[in-house]
Structure formats: C-alpha cells, structure tokens
Amino acid sequence: MLLGSHVSMSGKKMLEGSAIEAHEYGETTFMIYTGAPQNTRRKSIEDLNITKGHEVMEKYGLSNIVVHAPYIINIANTTKPETFNLGVDFLQQEIERTQAIGAKDIVLHPGAHVGAGVDAGINKIIEGLNEVLTNDNNVRIALETMAGKGTEIGRSFEELARIIDGVHNNERLSVCFDTCHTHDAGYNVKEDFDGVLNEFDKIIGVDRIKVVHVNDSKNDRGAQKDRHENIGFGYIGFDALNYIVHHDSFKDIPKILETPYVGEDKKNKKPPYKLEIEMLKQQHFDPELKNKVMQQ
C-alpha cells in the first residue's frame, strides 16, 4: 500500500533526509516541498542530494513520491500581472525540480480569483497552465480539490473540470483528491464516499486522480474552512478515512497524510505520522493516539 506523509526537505541532506524521515514513520511513499511553501527561495537541483535520496528510497522500498508546489503561486490572479507572471515562471522551475527528483506529480492549489469572480479566475488559470505546460517533460500538475475558503477556485468538481477542459496539453493534468477539503466544500465524504467518487467520475473521471491527501477535518461538512485534523479525531472520522485509504480505486496511488503535529506547546509539537500509519494499516482506531504521540 502506498501510504505516507508530508516530510521535510532541508539542510544538507535534502532528499536523503526526506527519505530517512519517511522510513522512520514506516511509510512506503512521501510528499515534499522543494523549499519553504511560503516563499520562492530554492536550492539548485545539484544541491537537492537526489542520488543519495534515491539510494535510501531503494533501500527502504519508498516509491511514487509527490512534490507540492508552494502556496504563494496564484495563477488565478487577474488583478496583479506580477503575481500571475511569478506563478507561471516559478511553477515551470518547480516542474524542472520535480522531474529531477523523479516525481511524476506536482500538487497545485488552482488559485484564488481575489474578487474578480470564478469565471475570470478559471480563465486565468487556463491561460497560466497553457503557458506552463509548453515545457518538454512528463511531469503532471495535480490540481487539488479545494475547501472553498475565501475566493479559492476548485471547490467543486465542475470548476476543476472546466480548467482541465480548457487546457491544451491536459493529458499532463491530474487531480489530487483531498479528503478534508472535499468534505469542507460540502461533499459527503463521511457517509457516502462511493457516491462522491461516482460524481467525480462522471464530471472528471476517476482515472485523473493520481494523489490522495488523507486528512480529517476540524469542521462540519460544508464549512469551507480547510482546517486539518488528525485521523479519526475530526468530523470525517476514522471509519470513512480508513475506507478511503483501502479503496480499490486508490490501490496504486500515493496516499499522503497532512495531519497536524500534536501538542499544546508550539515549541514541542510532535509528528503523528508513524502512529497514524500504523493505525490505518491495522484498520483499527486508537483513541489514545495523541497521548501516545506525545510520549514518543
């Protein structure tokens, strides 16, 4: 089963350190940002320690890794040309890094229309993706299902379908299905996941899903908040998330946890991924998980 989490990529070890961290959590795949998600400061490809990273991955059976584009990219912005241009240029650079790392998909938040309206935002995203996808490689951009916070685009399957339909090289577009976001956008992930998946299949096609973000939610369905919760401790619940993780449709797809670190003290929060992954492998909810994480 391809199950992992977001891990860090920093210091001198970079990808090697990411692979070691993923192995320590008992993962078979993982997701990284190529640098801080809040800025565009990046190391050169030569400094990402890719060869050693791949050696560690091979040693520990890690594969199908995923890259996440930084949050600052907003190619839906119609009001600031500099924001749009930065997004296009930086996304092209990120795709080059993604290919060098050996990942097939880079996850992208489609963007926010910042008041110009959904139609204008979607048209701008299509313009940006058509420009980005002229580069010659086989990396896919995985458009993420969004919660609908603020002016986010991608809160409905129809919005994502409109983007995909408008892009010329759309064989290089995939979808990252985020359980928390989709729940927060109003879909009944908790009680009728197969119904949600059937709807997705009719509108976009399930074969477009190449990454799944497995997150519980701190909010009720339809809240449009996007606040992740640990597996089984939120409004989606363990049973639904366990069902999704073991779903036949996602057997060969990386499933990535982005659940929050545990702990009241901001300086002493601990990653939950090792125990959350064990829990999902055993298919049995542990209500003591957060306490056990703090005792690690």
Swiss-Prot record:
Residues where Zn(2+) 1 binds: H68, H109, E144
An example Gene Ontology molecular-function term: zinc ion binding
Note on cofactor: Binds 3 Zn(2+) ions.
The enzyme's E.C. designation: 3.1.21.2
Catalytic reactions on record: Endonucleolytic cleavage to 5'-phosphooligonucleotide end-products
SMART domains in the cross-refs: AP2Ec
Residues the entry annotates as binding Zn(2+) 3: H181, D226, H228
Cofactor names: Zn(2+)
GO terms under biological process: base-excision repair
Binding site for Zn(2+) 2: E144, D178, H213, E258
Entry's family note: Belongs to the AP endonuclease 2 family.
NCBIfam families on file: nfo, PRK01060.1-1
Task of the protein: Endonuclease IV plays a role in DNA repair. It cleaves phosphodiester bonds at apurinic or apyrimidinic (AP) sites, generating a 3'-hydroxyl group and a 5'-terminal sugar phosphate.
Name of protein: Probable endonuclease 4
Source organism of this protein record: Staphylococcus aureus (strain MRSA252)
Name of the gene encoding the protein in the UniProt record: nfo
